Amino acid sequence: MRTWRIHELGDPIDQLTLDEVAEPELEPGRVLVEVDAVGLAFPDVLQCRGEYQVKPPLPYCPGSETAGRVSAVGDGVDQALVGQRVVALGGGLAERVVLPEGSVFT
């Protein structure tokens, strides 16, 4: 799966790399989203520079605003979400992303 990732802090234009990574693993309470679109905003830039209050461990995939379709859900998540178009928070600069159910909205 292709994903854009930050391996070192700095300006996104200099630090973003397109990586081939393993498919994300679905866990209980989580949702797999096939990403259709992602929004990058100023908080993403600050996070890439290490200047935002949330500091994910490196490497990480930015993209705080994600839109797509749910392709699978983990144990404990309503199966009715599968196939639904959603917006979600976090890690969206990838082909697919696994997120906590509470970060996905219909």
Annotate each language-model stretch with its function:
Residues 5-8, 35:
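Pocket-edge structural micro-motifs
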Residues 15, 46, 57, 79, ...:
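NAD(P)H dinucleotide-binding glycine-rich loop of Rossmann-like/cofactor-binding domains
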Residues 22-40, 51-92:
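Glycine-rich beta-strand-centered segment in the early N-terminal region that forms part
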Residues 8, 23, 99-101:
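Active-site donor-binding loop signature of nucleotide-sugar glycosyltransferases
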Residues 1-2:
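Extreme N-terminal starter segment of soluble prokaryotic enzymes
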Residues 6, 48, 71-72, 98-99:
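Short beta-strand-to-turn element immediately C-terminal to the catalytic PLP-Schiff-base lysine
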Residues 10-18, 42-44:
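Short N-terminal binding/cap micro-motifs at the start of the first secondary-structure element
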